[in-house]
Every structure is written in structure tokens, then in C-alpha cells.
């Protein structure tokens, strides 16, 4: 799994590529989000478009990232499609996250 961070205005876009499962990226995502929050970056967009699969441990870590950001007065939004979107729906995570189909829509929502 690969994680890259880029900035668009005040939003940190975390681009994740590859499979996310226990031991394969869940801790890397946690560490990267902690770094961002520690640096004062509290508007975070998780771009998971290039993640073909997430197991329950990885989903739990995404939820934990949301919780950490909220504790700092921040927000985490997600961009997902396909099987990952189905998994989020089954877990009813649409109640927790603002979910978008593309990065541009998510960025536009941050400036509302």
C-alpha cells in the first residue's frame, strides 16, 4: 500500500493506493493522519479510489482517524467507489462520514 499527501488550500488530501488490510496499511494510515493532525492540518480528505479492498481492521482505522480529527475540531471526508463503497454502506458508515464519488466534489464540500 502507498500513501501520498498533497494540499489543496487548507485541505490535506491523503491519496491511498493498494489493498488495505490488517498489517497492510492500517497502521501507516493511522500514522500519517496523526502526523497531519499534529501539524495542525484538521481538514482531511481520504482518497480511497485506488483501494480495491478494505478489511474490518482498516475500516476501523478509518473510523478512528475520523474520531481523532473530530477531537481536534477537524473533519475527515472520504472518496470511495466500488467494493469499498459497498462495504461502507453495509457498515452504515454513511452515518459517520461525508462520502463522495470524486475528489473535486469532496473539495467543494469543504468550502461550503
Language model: regions and residue ranges:
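A short, charged, amphipathic alpha-helix used as a generic interaction element across diverse proteins
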Residues: 110-112
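STAS-typified acidic loop motif
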Residues: 2-31
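Short acidic-hydrophobic, aromatic-tinged amphipathic segments that line or gate anion-handling sites
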Residues: 98-102
